[in-house]
Regions:
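Charged, amphipathic alpha-helical oligomerization/scaffolding segments
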Residues: 28-31, 256, 263, 295, ...
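Intrinsic disorder at enzyme termini
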Residues: 1-21, 389-408
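Glycine-rich beta->alpha junctions and the first turn(s) of the following alpha-helix
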Residues: 205-301
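Glycine-rich phosphate/pyrophosphate-binding beta-alpha loops
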Residues: 159-164, 245-249, 382
Length: 408
């Protein structure tokens, strides 16, 4: 039952997305986003588990975008997945988060499992239409695996387990106690209906209310040897999962900013009068409001250019698989940290300042413009952006990368 630790050329991803691939999945994501936009505010207020939304993602084909074609998936690229996340975030930040985490939980198959075992995992996720959640929050105490015949027993608890409330499976990391894998951290996959696995309905936060990010408790949960993906190591290619998730966050914040701008523009154009001291005939013709929107639009466009460039770079580095070096991994991680910084600050600023051009009436609960701010403000606290600035500054000054972690 020993888990191999040798470096493996694990990822099946190659090259960059074609124009045809990007065009197709943009259209799919846009259609899903339009459907979500119809009642995003109403669903947010109900704060129910997003089972219908998960089914919408499943029926659209988005869940299998990154699954290699030879195993029944779409054979898409991360650049395409990042764009899909961004487009969904225009309309519904919660469901964009659900999709983003699904992608990087599901592709744990490629990052952790030996190459010869990946095909069976890919085929199972396609056959069963799995939405993948997770239970890996590193801030909480480490989950523990104790050895028993043909497997393990899992105990502990994790908060902020995104997708666990609606996903069919979750990816979990835990420390092994005893046996030949003693001291190793293993990544494994559990069905969410496993005996002893309790989904705690405690996700009631300011924003991202439909991200199904509840807590999970484990009481002597059986983990079969066949459910183990592999060991969590510091192999450069396997640790690219975390910068990839951080880049998904950057696209997510950008998408929320773009959604807030679009909604703000709509509201401003609908204001037929003007401020009594203005010489403009309408609010939209007032240069003060034009200046504000121009500034926010320019900042958003700059973030877009950066994350699009990094999406392509991420695909190219992933394609190198086991040949990825620690230096290449560090360089891309820092570049993504830069994007995380500017996307966080731009997302929060846009979602906040959009009210300056839409006026008091836009704070009405019927309008729901606050949904953008609540969502980006909540998720942007995932990991402190100041530490991303330190990460970038340290690398810029001394060429020193941060230690590998579930945040860096």
């Amino acid at each position: 039952m020993s888990v191999a630790t040798a470096a493996l050329a694990r990822t099946p991803f190659t090259g960059n997305a074609t124009t045809g691939e990007l065009t197709h999945w943009r259209a799919v994501a846009t259609e899903v986003a339009q459907s979500l936009a119809v009642d995003a505010l109403e669903r947010d207020r109900k704060n129910e588990q997003p089972h219908a939304e998960a089914q919408l993602l499943r029926s659209s084909g988005l869940l299998d975008l990154l699954v290699p074609a030879e195993f029944g998936g779409a054979g898409g690229h991360f650049e395409t997945a990042f764009e899909a996340i961004r487009i969904l975030a225009n309309a519904d930040g919660s469901i964009a988060q659900l999709l983003a985490y699904h992608y990087f939980n599901q592709t744990g198959i490629a990052f952790y499992a030996p190459a010869k075992q990946q095909g069976a995992w890919w085929e199972r996720t396609v056959a069963h239409g799995w939405l993948w959640g997770d239970s890996v929050n590193p801030v909480d105490p480490t989950l523990l695996l104790t050895v028993e015949a043909d497997g393990y027993r899992l105990n502990g608890a994790k908060r902020f387990s995104t997708g666990s409330g609606v996903g069919e499976v979750i990816i979990v990391n835990a420390l092994v106690q005893g046996g030949e894998n003693d001291g190793k951290v293993l990544a494994f996959v559990l069905p969410t209906d496993r005996e002893g696995l309790e989904l705690v309905d405690d996700w009631d936060y300011l924003g991202q209310r439909l991200s199904a990010s509840n807590s999970v408790r484990y009481s002597n949960v059986r983990v079969d040897a066949a459910e183990i993906l592999g060991e969590v190591t510091e192999e450069p290619v396997s640790t690219l999962l975390i910068p990839g998730l951080q880049l998904a966050f950057a696209n997510f914040y950008l998408g929320i900013a773009e959604g807030a701008l679009a909604r703000g523009k709509q509201l401003l154009l609908g204001r037929k009068n003007a401020w009594f001291l203005s010489t403009a005939p309408t609010y939209s013709r007032d240069v003060i409001f034009q200046r504000t929107l121009g500034e926010l639009k320019a900042r958003t466009a700059a973030v877009a250019a950066l994350v699009e460039k990094l999406g392509r770079a991420y695909d190219l580095l992933i394609a190198k698989a086991g040949d990825v070096t620690a230096e290449e991994r560090a360089e891309l991680a820092v570049a993504i940290a830069e994007a995380k910084i500017v996307s966080t600050e731009t997302g929060v600023e846009v979602a906040n300042r959009i009210f300056e051009v839409t006026g008091t009436s836009s704070t009405s609960n019927d309008v729901g413009l606050d949904l953008y701010w609540r969502n980006v403000r909540t998720h942007s606290l995932h990991d402190p952006v100041d530490y991303k600035k330190i990460e970038v500054g340290q690398y810029f000054l001394h060429g020193e990368a941060q230690p590998i972690s579930l945040y860096t």
